[in-house]
Regions:
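Helix-loop boundary and gating motifs at the non-cytosolic
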Residues: 49-68, 74
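Loop-to-transmembrane helix entry
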Residues: 65-84, 133, 166-170
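C-terminal membrane-cytosol helix-exit motif in multi-pass small-molecule transporters
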Residues: 1-16, 212-216
Length: 218
């Protein structure tokens, strides 16, 4: 029933290209080689995704141990704090229209850097202070991540209007690669060196994303 309702209710769009599926996939590599703006957007979003995923994939394990001794429900509650990033989408879109997406991407990356780096202060605080810091940091870097993503989409959509879906596919592929790498790296460094190593990894990924956004040209 859901499928039937979608079939009848969703709008119909004419395809913007007559390429067959194999040619569409091959064209992704062509778009990557052709457009430096696409490479910068994909690389910076993918780098930031490493820290984003490293944090969320290790948070529950960290909260389960000392000094918090919290269950998985507490980690799930942190997701509500992270959901605040969804509020950044319309704001980032409006700012990108008014100030330009380049400025918003840099601000988003800088916000993520500050939010990740702030977690290094946790050992100086008591347990409740550490939890407050974690919540504030989660809200901050999620706002930065979502703001960068919306602005990157604005950038890539303006590159070649007839290939927007394919440009978006390249952007999200880079982001998902970063998330997969962040999950693996986060688990590795947490097991070897603990939570502060995850903080260093996340901060480094955000700094790298900011450096890419500060680069000119290619």
């Amino acid at each position: 029933m859901t499928g039937a309702a979608a079939w009848h209710g969703l709008p119909r769009f004419r395809p913007t290209t007559h390429l067959h599926y194999g040619a569409l996939l091959a064209s992704l590599a062509t778009l990557w080689r052709r457009h430096g703006a696409l490479r910068r957007a994909t690389l910076s979003q993918g780098l930031l995704a490493i820290g984003f995923s490293a944090f969320w994939s290790t948070l529950a394990v960290m909260l389960h141990g000392a000094p918090f001794h919290l269950g998985s429900g507490a980690a799930g509650a942190f997701g509500l704090a992270g959901a605040a990033g969804a509020l950044a989408a319309p704001l980032a879109g409006r700012l990108a229209d008014r100030k330009g997406p380049e400025l918003v991407t840099r601000f988003g990356a800088l916000l993520a850097v500050v939010s990740f780096a702030a977690m290094a202060l946790a050992p100086m605080l008591d347990v409740h202070g550490q939890l407050v810091l974690l919540v504030a940091s989660a809200i901050g870097f999620d706002l930065g991540f979502q703001g960068m993503l919306i602005s990157h989409q604005t950038i890539v959509y303006g590159i070649e209007p007839g290939a927007r879906s394919r440009l978006n596919a390249v952007l999200f592929t880079g982001m998902f690669i970063g998330m997969a790498a962040g999950s693996a790296l986060g688990a590795l460094v947490f097991a070897q060196w603990g939570w502060m190593a995850v903080v260093v990894l996340a901060t480094g990924s955000a700094v790298s994303a900011l450096m890419v956004r500060m680069m000119r040209g290619r």
